[in-house]
């Protein structure tokens, strides 16, 4: 069902973009289980570390994880008046499951939920659906006519769109293939220890698939898992080329770039950069740099299209970023959420962060300054996933605008229109007065191993998602 928002006057859109100060920031154990985050054995730091900010009335600043920081503030950029507004276009609602994954391509939107159904939407109306029978759909990526889905049960399904009927989807296989599983099972050396007293084939994930990332140029698919590994697949023949023992806890996010670099974020509190080398028909990934080591779980990653900036979100509600010139250098921290950051997307000069606090923060990058353009509110549950597409109609008018899809555990997908030239003036005024929402300077020293020692650890137990 599509709920129209076009009947709302444009002047009222600004009212949608302020967080409700009365929203509860309490996350119950039931909610933790509901959005698929499991506790880690890693120790949590005490809340005494955190110096709560003084602006209690500010919706943006009510985070229980906000803390004092040694970094200096940057100045807010000036904004123009009479700029286009951001706002809700509509909602896609089908009361059958929490939304865990999204993927947008051309005029189609794919949504995955814990109902085991994958639904396809076109022009904001339900267009098609197909059942996967393989557990909660945690990730969806699209490569040409192929759709890859990652599942809670550790499986990766491959689907194809019918060339005669775009609404028909047929499962074309599973990764790894049954043939490869059979061949690998004949050799004892292909079994690795995945848990105490438990072994499994190295080509199979032994726990939930948390994230998928495509490198279309190289024809590769990356899958991250709670089994602490990243696996590399060749799309052409569905072969598993490599299994990377990447982290000491669940891998929550993986992003492949066009420059042979892969980034991974984990519940162990680290973000790692991997260098990909081609060795004949196979790949070899070596660790380049550990970007951060912190107590809070890394829950989301995003990389700008040109690879100039890497963003990661954490269970403490913070978004950190690195800037890349000749090497990766720590750039700053964005504070906009009061609960865990669950998803990130970068589009043009904008950064979008979705959170368990039910909001989406929209940031604009200009050099080393990030301005919070607006806070999109409307979901009644944690925002679990985001997808962003260029607004083609706005592009024709030379107005750089984006269509943002947000999936939530409230069982809905909301559709937003966001302009790069719009700034919520009320939000900006509040930020300036409190001087709390800011980007920090490049003053923090790096450790000898090249990693940044972050003090942004949180007392949250939301480590896997």
From Swiss-Prot:
Disruption phenotype: No visible phenotype under normal growth conditions, but hyperactive pollen germination. It is found in: Nucleus; Cytoplasm. It holds the Pfam family WD40. Expressed specifically in pollen. Not detected in roots, stems or leaves. WD repeats lie at residues 94-131, 132-169, 204-243, 246-284, 293-332, 336-373, 378-426. Its main location: nucleus. It comes from the Eukaryota. A motif (Nuclear exporting signal) lies at residues 344-346. Keywords: Cytoplasm, Nucleus, Repeat, WD repeat. InterPro entries: G-protein_beta_WD-40_rep, JINGUBANG-like, WD40/YVTN_repeat-like_dom_sf, WD40_repeat_dom_sf, WD40_rpt. Residues 21-30 have a biased composition (Polar residues). GO terms for cellular component: cytoplasm; nucleus. Gene3D superfamilies: YVTN repeat-like/Quinoprotein amine dehydrogenase. The keyword Nucleus applies. GO terms for biological process: pollen germination. Interacts with TCP4. PANTHER family: F-BOX AND WD40 DOMAIN PROTEIN, PROTEIN JINGUBANG. This is Protein JINGUBANG. The gene is JGB.
């Amino acid at each position: 069902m599509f709920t129209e928002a076009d009947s709302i006057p444009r002047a009222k859109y600004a009212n949608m973009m302020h967080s409700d100060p009365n929203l509860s920031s309490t996350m119950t154990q039931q909610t933790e289980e509901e959005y698929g985050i499991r506790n880690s054995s890693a120790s949590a730091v005490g809340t005494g570390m955190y110096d709560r900010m003084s602006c209690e009335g500010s919706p943006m600043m009510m985070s229980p994880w906000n803390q004092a920081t040694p970094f200096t503030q940057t100045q807010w950029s000036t904004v123009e008046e009479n700029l286009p507004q951001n706002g809700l276009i509509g909602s896609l609602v089908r009361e059958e499951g929490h939304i865990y994954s999204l993927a947008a391509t051309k005029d189609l939107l794919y949504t995955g939920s814990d109902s085991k159904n994958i639904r396809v939407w076109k022009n904001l109306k339900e267009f098609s659906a197909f059942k996967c029978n393989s557990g909660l759909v945690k990730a969806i990526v699209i490569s040409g006519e192929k759709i890859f889905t990652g599942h809670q049960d550790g499986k990766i399904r491959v689907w194809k769109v019918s060339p005669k009927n775009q609404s028909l989807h047929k499962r074309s296989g599973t990764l790894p293939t049954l043939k490869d599983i059979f061949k690998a099972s004949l050799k004892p050396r292909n079994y690795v220890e995945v848990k105490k007293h438990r072994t499994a084939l190295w080509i199979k994930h032994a726990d939930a698939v948390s994230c998928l990332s495509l490198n279309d140029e190289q024809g590769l698919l990356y899958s991250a898992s709670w089994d602490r590994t990243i696996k590399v697949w060749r799309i052409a023949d569905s072969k598993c080329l490599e299994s990377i023992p990447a982290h000491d806890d669940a891998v929550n996010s993986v992003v492949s770039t066009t420059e042979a670099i892969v980034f991974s974020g984990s519940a162990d509190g680290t973000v790692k950069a991997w260098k990909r080398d081609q060795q004949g028909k196979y790949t070899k990934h070596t660790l380049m740099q550990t970007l951060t080591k912190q107590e809070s779980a890394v829950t989301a990653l995003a990389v700008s299209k040109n690879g100039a900036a890497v963003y990661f979100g954490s269970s403490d509600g913070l978004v950190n970023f690195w800037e890349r010139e000749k090497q990766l250098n720590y750039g700053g921290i964005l504070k906009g959420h009061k609960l865990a950051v669950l998803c990130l997307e970068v589009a043009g000069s904008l950064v979008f962060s979705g959170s368990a606090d039910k909001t989406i923060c929209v940031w604009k990058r200009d050099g080393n300054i990030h301005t919070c353009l607006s806070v999109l509110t409307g979901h009644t549950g944690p925002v679990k996933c985001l997808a962003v597409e260029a607004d083609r109609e706005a592009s024709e008018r030379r107005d750089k605008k984006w269509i943002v899809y947000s999936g939530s555990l409230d069982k809905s997908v909301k559709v937003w229109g966001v302009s790069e030239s719009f700034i919520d003036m009320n939000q900006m005024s509040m930020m300036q007065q409190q001087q709390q929402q800011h980007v920090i300077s490049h003053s923090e020293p790096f450790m000898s191993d090249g990693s940044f020692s972050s003090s942004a650890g949180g007392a949250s137990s939301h480590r896997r998602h």
